[in-house]
Design a protein with these regions (language model features):
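N-terminal accessory segment at the very beginning of proteins
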Residues: 3, 21-243, 247-249, 255-257, ...
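Bacterial N-terminal signal peptides that target proteins for export
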Residues: 1-9
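TerminUS-proximal long segments
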Residues: 249, 331, 529, 547, ...
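Catalytic-domain carbohydrate-binding cleft regions of carbohydrate-active enzymes
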Residues: 108-642, 647-648
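Solvent-exposed beta-strand/loop surfaces of large extracellular or lumenal domains
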Residues: 61-75, 358, 622-640, 745-767
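Hydrophobic h-region of N-terminal signal peptides that target proteins for export
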Residues: 12-20
């Protein structure tokens, strides 16, 4: 394991006997010692601290894969014996064994450890409140609220009894586990361990929960925050934020097996890809990103599990194929790879890497590149990846990040298995950023705490069946709560086990176009989920939702900026903003997309209607304009072309003209869709869409402020503020008003061409150029 250059120190923890204690305060750290063991409290802020318990003076080393920030400014706190106080928290220390109780500033107990430690593993046992609920834990497909459940976190495929159809078990699916637990009681626990860990959330005893990691360290962060957003934001202060992707990556991604999937590899060829690109453009299907999946690769000794970085012989002109993609406005062209290298016809990658000691000695093929080692990454990039980047590849799909499995693994090797997906995604992400001179991009399947930095996960290989559809939605909700905001899935499912189901395909596509990232891909040879294979009507509906996503790109991109600033995921459960409404805790087939749009996928075959729960506040039907009061269930008709979508009162939704690709033309014309409240503010975000200059403050924000009074509605649009200079916008406005206006003015001038739809109660008018402040005044 030494060759991994992965330094992890594991210290077993024993139960502490009663002994005299001493305390030492140094900087942000408070160390409590006794003859039987020590505990260190490290203050990160007035609402977050780290707890480490060890049997001796030595503390574990700081690893660099999960947590990237260990240095915090001096925190204002006081220590009085076994009491630590900040302006927000009161921490009480108890020993024999060392354990803590945490209360808020008012003295309300949030977290109370009952016991801690064991002989062969570490654990903390915590008192559980009768009405406490638990969320997070990574990309869980089983449920949203884990109260009363047992959760095992280890990067792996689904474990357990194999279903009759397919090979996955949603109860144990762990493509991207994250040891982060969020409580509705205003706190979170981030278990800082890469060792496989277990969470008993009231399964064994309904008045307490525990988290443990056999053989690992008792090392965790306690995070306080009244809102989930504050908890996730603090977690990302430790593990890193999700960076903005290239703007084109918010458009549609197309994956292709090049005409030949598994058992049809010989049919894969570059002509198929060229024709596919042409057909997509001919059919007016908007898309920006494309990658070729496994069958572009020449398979050698290791079969489809190894990567030769050589195209199959049927690809006569790979560079010409990629050039054709760029000529037809594909923004980024990528390739599927594996972490194992293999010898091909021209490249002896495996032999060379092994001779140089750049592969991991896993007791098996010994073919996995040691992505933990900078030297190995540098060699891999220059001698393997460069074979295809020279042809024009601009990103990789890094598949099977779970490949690192040891024979007879020890604790350090078990930890390496969980950290490997991060190192595996980091290498191409950072190198492509340097090569392309713009934002990095990588498309990966597995992850662990910190994977959000590189930057997105897809849900893996789930079947094209109704039984997997709603679990996929749960996975997206859960992974967002776990700090991974960019997430996607194969629209329509991946593996085709049963007869083609147009209803399932379209319902999945509708939801997929309202996911953080939209991917069209599947291995259903020879159709591959191409919309035209499902018929003319299906293609029409596909284009309807694809075009809607492109029209909403100003809203989606602004929501991505919001996530970068505040850590709010693009896709959130209803309880994210309504923690006091327990009705929302079990809802896994509705979610918020951004702050203002509620999406309600249809997850039942041939459903003619579906019930929708509305949290507190007022809502508006995106399709019909119907107003709905909150805190109630209501049923809606769902013909195949309709997925229920609702706007939150106060919403200001910027839209652009639908385009065939993101940069088809400047987004000069901005249409605002507004469901006004008494007062709401929206800030539309813009930048160059490609560079990292936004991290230096080079961006523009246009503030839009809406005010509704008894007899008037006012919209104020300011000039863009910031160092980036966007194109001048021409604004049109659609605003839902219950009464027909008497007159409309813009910038003090009467508007004659306004229209009011009595049925929808919708006013539309042109607000004009936005290169100066625009004030619209509607007298009602």
């Amino acid at each position: 394991m030494k060759n991994l250059k992965l330094k992890l120190t594991f210290l077993s923890l024993c139960a502490f006997a009663t002994a005299a204690h001493a305390q030492q305060v140094k900087g942000n750290s408070v160390l409590y010692t006794s003859s039987q063991g020590n505990m260190r409290i490290e203050m990160c802020s007035e609402s977050m601290f780290r707890v480490t318990k060890v049997p001796a003076q030595q503390m574990p080393d700081n690893e660099k894969w999960m947590v990237v920030n260990y240095n915090f400014p001096q925190v204002n706190f006081s220590v009085d014996g076994k009491q630590i106080k900040t302006s927000k928290l009161q921490v009480s220390i108890q020993e024999a064994p060392w354990r803590i109780q945490v209360a808020d500033a008012s003295g309300k107990v949030l977290y109370e450890e009952l016991t801690s430690g064991c002989k062969d593993s570490i654990y903390n046992e915590v008192k559980m409140n009768p009405d406490e609920h638990f969320f997070g834990f990574g990309e869980r497909m089983d449920r949203i609220d884990q109260r009363g459940q047992r959760v095992h976190l280890n990067v792996e495929l689904g474990r357990g009894s194999k279903p009759a159809v397919g090979g996955k078990d949603i109860l144990r699916a762990n493509y991207c586990p994250v040891p982060l637990m969020l409580s509705n009681k205003g706190y979170a626990v981030f278990f800082h361990t890469a060792v496989p860990n277990d969470w008993d959330m009231g399964w064994t005893n309904n008045d307490k929960y525990s988290f443990s990691a056999p053989g690992g360290d008792n090392d965790y962060y306690f995070i306080y925050g009244e809102q989930l957003e504050a908890l996730i934001h603090s977690y990302q202060q430790l593990t890193g934020v999700a960076p903005l992707m290239p703007r084109a990556a918010y458009g549609l991604h197309i994956g292709s097996y090049s005409g030949g999937t598994w058992h049809h590899e010989s049919k894969a060829n570059d002509t198929y890809v060229v024709n596919l690109i042409d057909r997509l453009r001919q059919e007016k299907i908007p898309f920006d990103m494309m990658w070729l999946d496994s069958t572009w690769r020449l398979f050698a000794k290791l079969g489809n599990g190894g990567c030769t970085f050589e195209f199959q012989d049927q690809f006569k002109d790979p560079k010409g194929m990629i050039d054709h993609a760029y000529k037809n406005h594909v923004a980024m062209f990528g390739l599927h790879i594996r972490s194992l290298v293999d010898n091909g016809k021209r490249n002896n990658l495996l032999t060379t890497a092994q001779k140089k000691g750049l592969t991991i000695q896993d007791g098996g093929t010994n073919a996995i590149i040691n992505f933990f080692d900078d030297k190995a990454v540098d060699w891999w990039w220059k001698n393997a990846a460069k074979k295809v980047t020279d042809l024009g590849a601009k990103f990789f799909k890094t598949d099977v990040g779970s490949a690192l499995n040891y024979n007879n693994p020890n604790i350090e090797q078990k930890a390496a298995h969980n950290l490997f997906p991060i190192a595996y995604a980091k290498a191409p992400y950072e190198n492509f950023a340097k090569l392309n001179g713009q934002r990095g991009f990588d498309h990966t399947r597995e992850g662990y705490a910190g994977i959000q930095r590189y930057p997105f996960i897809w849900a893996g290989d789930w079947g094209s069946e109704w039984q997997w559809f709603e679990p996929i939605i749960r996975g997206g909700i859960n992974i967002g709560l776990s700090g991974v905001g960019y997430w996607s899935h194969c629209m329509g499912g991946f593996e085709q086990y049963s007869a083609y189901d147009t209803d399932l395909y379209l319902r999945w596509v509708q939801m997929g176009m309202f996911s953080p990232v939209s991917i069209l891909f599947g291995m259903d040879h020879p159709r591959y989920h191409a919309p035209w294979t499902y018929g003319e009507e299906a293609q029409k509906i596909f284009i309807q939702y694809d075009s809607l996503r492109y029209a909403l790109l100003p809203y989606i991109y602004t929501s991505a900026w919001d996530m970068y600033k505040t850590s709010r995921p693009l896709m959130t459960p209803l309880f994210y903003d309504h923690l006091q409404d327990v009705n929302t805790y079990q809802i896994s087939d509705q979610y918020m997309f951004g702050r203002d749009m509620m999406v309600c996928p249809v997850t039942v075959k041939n459903a003619l209607s579906r019930p929708v729960y509305f949290p507190g506040g007022d809502w508006l039907d995106f399709w019909t304009g119907e107003r709905i009061s909150g805190r109630q269930y209501k049923s809606f008709l769902t013909p195949i072309e309709i997925m229920p979508i609702f706007l939150r009162r106060g919403a200001i939704i910027p839209r652009q003209e639908a385009m065939q690709y993101v940069d088809e033309r400047p987004n000069t014309n901005i249409s605002l869709l507004i469901y006004p409240s008494e007062h709401s503010v929206y800030e539309m975000y813009e930048d160059d869409g490609k560079s990292l200059d936004y991290q230096k403050g080079v961006y523009a924000v246009t503030k839009m402020e809406s005010r509704l009074a008894q007899n008037e509605w006012i919209l104020n649009i300011t000039t863009p503020k910031g160092d980036y200079k966007p194109v001048s916008h021409y604004y049109s406005v659609s605003v839902y008003l219950d009464k027909k206006p008497k007159l409309v003015t813009v910038a003090g001038k009467f508007v004659d061409g306004w229209k009011y739809d009595e049925k929808l109660r919708l006013l539309t008018f042109d607000a004009g150029e936005g290169d100066m402040e625009v004030l619209s005044l509607i007298h009602i």
